[in-house]
């Protein structure tokens, strides 16, 4: 696959909106092509804004593997969690309208709102919804909408009240998506509009984001849209179906292009001012969104080559990540979606912005491109970020392989299940997710999540009363251990799950589930 992406086909698949490439970006073409070859990325779009001007917006490669349609500046990609800044902006606009205050209690706007702890329910503010300090664990509750489920937004928010808290309220950073489903409801309640209508009329139309779509459901026939790609079983690159996320669009639903995201960056870097000089939002609102609320622990680099990227401070504001690089404050976010990942980075002190959109799942690709662009403008010692991130990816794969080898070495291969297979067949219920069904089929077992069509697969015996679920959809890369615990009478008491690979996306939060038999 690398040979195809790095070969002659890609030379005919680049487009560029502006005729002259700035001197600082003369090497960008070669960098992007190296990234595509190194990380097997079919298509990439990049836009760069400097001093109020769009200095580059361009596409490389193809929208879909094996098809000739090129990625262009107008090609739509899922921007996933880069949507969070739009949600935060929407709430600040409503604050400017006098419809709410950011420190209002959520329950004052949504009386039915509940967290699993009554104290947190009563104290949670609108600002808390945006800043990842609720006490929820990483990705808690994501299985209510990831992969696509049949739950509505209202059902997701209602079920939030059963998702357990694992930390203290406002105690530490833990990234979540589910509280943005609540933020979506607050916007609708305060504005009297749907979240989609609010985004369209108050942001997209005013900024000039004509091609941007509310979510995958709103892509139109003939839209210039990229197709997502994933490595099935972490190996073979193929296309994947888009996630339908209308039940939590506030966390990550938007599809946009390099062209439209450049307009968004222009507004951000102009303290909320639009092209005509009027204000989308005030400088005060921007200051609030860009102010650190929740500090983050800064991890050590996985390989020495990534050390120059390590921040001196890191935290989260309202819909934005905050850190530093080469003496400059960065305001940024990433987005991850089945088959697509992206990164938007602002350097306010240099009036610089860069967005990288890709139709593959390797974050190393957008990081290598982003840091290469930042280096070109900020100066200092040159660094080979493509090589550095390639080594980081390899290290991550090695660690995952070692963990799997340890599982295999510790496996009791001679053990047998305690029950006949039919003894495990039942409907099981988790308080926040709902039902999981295990059925006996032929000589084996199958497992399916009742509200998630993609989570259906066969159970393969591992040891004792532990199985591995092998999902039918091999693009998920989320196979999991399924452990049945028995009571003294030899009946299943509870079922717990755990992803088998460290590389599985954190949104597959199987470890937060506790299933018990439905009586």
Language-model features, listed with the residues they occupy:
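Catalytic loop of the DD-peptidase/beta-lactamase superfamily, centered on the K-T-G motif
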Residues: 20-56, 188-201, 205, 239-519
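Bacterial N-terminal signal peptides that target proteins for export
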Residues: 1-6
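Conserved beta-strand in the GNAT
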Residues: 59
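Short coil/turn segments at secondary-structure boundaries
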Residues: 141-146, 171-173, 215-219, 278-280, ...
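Active-site-proximal loop and beta-strand segments within enzyme catalytic domains
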Residues: 39, 62-177, 184-185, 191-193, ...
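N-terminal signal peptide c-region/cleavage motif recognized by signal peptidases
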Residues: 12-17
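Short, structured active-site-proximal loop/turn typified by the sulfatase FGly-forming signature C/S-X-P-X-R
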Residues: 210
